Each structure stands twice: as structure tokens, then as C-alpha cells.
Swiss-Prot record:
The record marks K34, K253 as: Transition state stabilizer. It holds the Pfam family AA_kinase. HAMAP family: ArgB (MF_00082). Its EC number is 2.7.2.8. The keyword Nucleotide-binding applies. One of its GO terms (molecular function) is ATP binding. The gene is argB. This is Acetylglutamate kinase. Pathway: Amino-acid biosynthesis; L-arginine biosynthesis; N(2)-acetyl-L-ornithine from L-glutamate: step 2/4. Keywords: Amino-acid biosynthesis, Arginine biosynthesis, ATP-binding, Cytoplasm, Kinase, Nucleotide-binding, Transferase. It comes from the Bacteria. InterPro entries: AceGlu_kinase-like_sf, AcgluKinase_fam, ArgB, Asp/Glu/Uridylate_kinase, Glu/AcGlu_kinase, NAGK-C.
Length: 296
């Protein structure tokens, strides 16, 4: 990407002028951002992401960050000599793995993100779904995609029962940027590991967000030939599920994105987190990036 310092002043002014209509349009609106993939592990992309989030806040939007941490969890499990297992894109989470998930997400990844936002000039507060009773969950009953009579036991993986967004709204009103780890709690105060894409999608719905933006390690949703699909409807997504084009970790991502679109989130985007400032390009310019999910 071109170094901003090398751009001529007139071109910089034109870029800012192009962003102005979007800044006006989205002023005061909530943007839920799922932060994951390479954008979380590359230092330059980490700094870019933090700067982008702070900029959105400074121009009057309300960014809410929900983060993943799969690679970091996998590294921690490897150090313990424990092998990670996935079923239909969900991490199998026994009691020991749940302890690792909580420690890595809330104690390591979340705090790194909060620190980066502070370095970029913003104010962030880290939360888990336990804080403020935000995310109530129950054990996920996972039915096999190909044989509905088969149910997989994925341990302490959670299915969201309800989200209370009051703590998030309070932080937004006080000029903070919420950074949320996808951990919920059950009736017996047990912890649940919840897919971050699902949390972001449900939270966007509850907050009546203007946009849900999911950062990934791909240009967006790809067909079987590797071509980018820029616009997908519910019917098209069902067909991609059926023929196996969408599989693995993309399953919960696309399902959650579609649920959010059906529930009234105005725009749902799956974009390439490996592209510097891709989030700003999606939100503040007329240049479309990645895949847009529509309910119809």
C-alpha cells in the first residue's frame, strides 16, 4: 500500500473529501467489528487496525470490537502438549481447554488490543461476556451437517441464550471503545467458549448496528475456483452450504453474518484483514471490498 507520507497534499485532501459523506451518514452509528486472522498476528496490521478503530471513534462512530484468538489458543495448548480439535468449525472445549481459552483471550489477546488502541490515542475497555452479565449461554448442541440424527459433543462450547448490551452502551456513551472476548456464562456460573463470529453477529443484532464487519484471512467468500463472490443472498448461501463450498471455520462465520442481515443489521461485510486499512476502505469509501451478505 502506498505510504501516506508520499501522497501529494491535494490527493490527501481529495481522499478526506471522499470520506466526508460517509462520516456524515454513519455519525452516531454502531459498527461491530470481528477482529481475527492475520490482522491479529502481524505487528504492522495490528497497529493499522488500532488506528482505524480510533479514527472511527474520533469522527463520531461507535466501534465495538469482538476478537478471536485461535492461533494464540493453539500455541498455548501446544505448550501444554494438548492437541486442538475442531468439529464443523467449532473448537472442542473440555474443562482444561476452557481454562486455557479464558486465560489466553481475556488475559493476553484482549489486553494487547486494549493497549494498542491506547497507543493509537483512543480509550478502550476490555470485557468478557461475564462482565455486566452480558452474554448468557448454554451448552451448544451440535447436529451433524450431513446426518441430522448425529449430535457431536463439543464440550464447553456455548450457544448464546441472551445478550444484555447495557454495559457496552454505557461504555459507548462515555467515549470508550469496548473490546470483547467471546466468553459466556451459564446457569451454574460455568464458562462457555463461544465462536467470536457468532458473538459479533448476535451483538450487532442486539445493538441494532449499522454495520457488521468480519475480518478474515481471505479476500472474502470464494467459490470453488477461488473467485471472490462480492454479493451473496440467503438462497445463494444455502446452495454454497449444500455443495460444500462453504465449510470449516467459514460455516459459523457465514451463518452468523446471514442471521445478522436477516435480523436487520443494515450491512454485513466479510473483508480481507490482510489488506492494510481494509476496514476504513470499506466503511469510508465507495470502493467495495470483500463479500456483502444480504438477506434477500
Amino acid at each position: 500500500m502506498t505510504d501516506l507520507l508520499s501522497i501529494a497534499p491535494r490527493d490527501k485532501a481529495e481522499i478526506l473529501a471522499q470520506a466526508l459523506p460517509y462520516i456524515r451518514k454513519f455519525h452516531g452509528k454502531t459498527m461491530v467489528i470481528k477482529y481475527g486472522g492475520n490482522a491479529m498476528t502481524d505487528p504492522a496490521l495490528q497497529a493499522d487496525f488500532a488506528e482505524d478503530v480510533v479514527l472511527l471513534k474520533l469522527v463520531g462512530m461507535n466501534p465495538v470490537v469482538v476478537h478471536g484468538g485461535g492461533p494464540q489458543i493453539e500455541q498455548a495448548l501446544n505448550r501444554l502438549g494438548k492437541k486442538g480439535e475442531f468439529i464443523q468449525g467449532m473448537r472442542v472445549t473440555d474443562a482444561e481447554t476452557m481454562e486455557v481459552v479464558e486465560w489466553v483471550l481475556a488475559g493476553e489477546v484482549q489486553q494487547d488490543i486494549v493497549g494498542l488502541i491506547h497507543q493509537a490515542g483512543g480509550k478502550a475497555v476490555g470485557l468478557t461476556g461475564r462482565d455486566g452479565g452480558m452474554i448468557r449461554a448454554k451448552k451448544l448442541k451440535m447436529v451433524d451437517n450431513k446426518d441430522p440424527s448425529v449430535e457431536h459433543d463439543v464440550g464447553q462450547v456455548g450457544d448464546i441464550v441472551a445478550i444484555d448490551p447495557s454495559v457496552v452502551k454505557a461504555l459507548q456513551d462515555d467515549a470508550f471503545i469496548p473490546v470483547i472476548s467471546p466468553i459466556g456464562f451459564g446457569e451454574e456460573n460455568e464458562s462457555y467458549n463461544i465462536n467470536a463470529d457468532v458473538v459479533a453477529s448476535k451483538l450487532a443484532t442486539v445493538l441494532q448496528a449499522e454495520k457488521l464487519v468480519l475480518l478474515t484471512n481471505t479476500p472474502g467468500v470464494l467459490d470453488k475456483e477461488g473467485k471472490l463472490l462480492t454479493d451473496l443472498t440467503a438462497r445463494e448461501i444455502d446452495a454454497l452450504f449444500a455443495d460444500g463450498t462453504i465449510s470449516g471455520g467459514m460455516l459459523p462465520k457465514i451463518s452468523g453474518a446471514l442471521d445478522a442481515a436477516k435480523a436487520g443489521v443494515n450491512a454485513v461485510h466479510i473483508i480481507d484483514g490482510r489488506v492494510p486499512h481494509s476496514m476504513l476502505l470499506e466503511i469510508l469509501t465507495d470502493q467495495a471490498y470483500g463479500t456483502m451478505i444480504r438477506s434477500h
